[in-house]
Amino acid sequence: MPEYPTEDTNASGKTSGSSPDDHTDDNAPSFFSCENLCIVQVPVSTGSLNGFSIGFVAVYMHLYEIFSGCSALESSGACSGNSKCTWIPNNSTCVWKDCNGAAGATTCKDGSGYNSLESGLFACSMIVGSMIGSIFAGKFLSKFGLKMSFIVSGVLGIVGSALIHVATRGSTLWVMCVGRFLMGLVLGLVCVASPMYVNENAHPKYRKTIGVLFQVFTTFGIMFAALLGLAIVKTPGHDKASGLLWRMQVFCSVSTALSALLLVLGLVVRKSKTSFAGGVDSAGEGVLDPNEYSVRQMLGPLAVGAVTAGTLQLTGINAVMNYAPEIMRNIGMDPMEGNSAVMSWNFVTALVAIPLVSRFTMRQLFLACSFMASCACLIMCGIPVYPGVASVDNRNIVATVGIAVFIAAFEFGVGSCFFVLAQDLFPRSFRPTGSSFVVMAQFIFNIMINLLYPITVEAISGGKGKSPEKGQSVSFIIFGIIGIICFVLQLRYLTPWEDGQGTSTSPTARCNAPTSPNNGEGEPATADMSPVEMSTPKHSGAA
């Protein structure tokens, strides 16, 4: 299988510093060729696992709420299938164990599902694991390589999935959290490794297209989880523990299968041609020195990367995903049906990014779409929802359209371009460290949103039990303002790393650096351009 060079070499064997995109498309294989599909399988498998793990939370919590509703169980066999329930032979009823046989069905229903603390632990366990995994991803990739990262991720994913199966059978929260934490470690590693593998090994003609597939299949995984959950709750017998338990196990088995697929991927995928000094694959030519640039030299790109992570998370994508089912409920839709509709729209809009990246630069898409998403948060999801601004009917319509616009803008450019930008902001030798930091930053912001959003909504709305419209409105106004601030900073400082620019790494210096119209030999100066800046096959619109 051919390996596409990332740098040109001259007669003396020294690198000329040219970008992969400087190579012509004459030797480009078909997109559906074997060698190209070998690269495509990486973002497809890793993105699907990432997406299903994200979509897992809302669906599983809903299924568990049904499963743990003891009063709905009508036989001793079904009741014994739930470790938190007990069967009362005298009146042939199933009650919550904490009821001690004295309480009625209404009290037992109060014990179904997770409480607020348990829900928080369940939701955040994977994100915390992802943050920790991304912290160590850079060192791990430099030492053991990309191929080994997929193998280790597959093994950890299988172990984590096995614990989730055990926790589902015994309704044990702490085992579930440990399993989700291990899955988080996997995702923290693959969110760095998968985009890096594509960046280092894909043919220049397809690098951006394949690069966005990680986000596209992340949205596919989220949608698949939502649709599978909808199918489960629409089948007869789903409200009985004896019938629901095996359905929940089937739902959990998707993560197991995807983790096994990741392990197989690690075993069969070819090694990346990029290796780092001090690593297990450091023999041979073209080895990169991970210590070529210090963190101090890279403070500028790292700061810009943190701002892009803020755009990804602090504009409220996770809050929108949580708020969307309630919006659908408000306009008369079933919550699970509404959730499936929103996640399907999320996937469809992500598909649009595939043709867009061949027409525009990553920078152009990211900037334009971040501005559009921020405006949607501020003007459509924020201000109109504030109590008294609009009637209830108009408010719901505008907010629903606003969420649709926000999701579309996010998937057109913000989500799809983020993981590619996390690579191209840094020189190749610094990418394990730089990309690891940027991905870690977005997980930190993710945790902040998951923890602070419900608290903020409740506090601004006047406390528990109050109508949430005021708190939701103010929250989305804040999201919009944060997005606008990030947009202004990125408009000034978001530029990809250019080979040969040396250590002038401050954002200001990089933005103000002059660009020569040619390379001294009458040819356009595309040699120093990163893939982020290659807007079209003719390189006609670098932003």
UniProtKB/Swiss-Prot annotation:
InterPro entries to which the protein is assigned, alphabetical: GLUT, MFS_dom, MFS_sugar_transport-like, MFS_trans_sf, Sugar/inositol_transpt
Name any one GO molecular function.
hexose transmembrane transporter activity
* Residues with attached carbohydrate: 90-91
List the keywords (alphabetical).
Glycoprotein, Membrane, Sugar transport, Transmembrane, Transmembrane helix, Transport
Q: What is this protein called?
A: Glucose transporter HT1
PANTHER family reported for this sequence: FACILITATED GLUCOSE TRANSPORTER PROTEIN 1, SOLUTE CARRIER FAMILY 2
Species this chain originates from: Trypanosoma vivax (Duttonella vivax)
Q: Where is the composition biased (Polar residues)?
A: 7-19, 503-519
For this UniProt entry, what is the primary localization, expressed as one broad class? membrane
Outline which residue ranges sit on the Extracellular face.
60-120, 169-172, 234-248, 322-337, 386-400, 458-470
Q: Where do the record's region annotations for Disordered lie?
A: 1-24, 503-543
Please explain the role this protein plays, according to its UniProt record.
Facilitative glucose transporter. Binds D-fructose and cytochalasin-B, but not D-galactose.
> Which gene is transcribed and translated to give this protein?
HT1
Where is this gene product found? Membrane
Stretches assigned to the Cytoplasmic side: 1-38, 142-147, 194-212, 270-300, 359-364, 422-436, 492-543
Give membrane topology per the record. Answer: Multi-pass membrane protein
Instruction: Provide the family line.
Output: Belongs to the major facilitator superfamily. Sugar transporter (TC 2.A.1.1) family.
Q: Which GO terms describe its cellular component?
A: membrane
- Membrane-spanning residues where? 39-59, 121-141, 148-168, 173-193, 213-233, 249-269, 301-321, 338-358, 365-385, 401-421, 437-457, 471-491
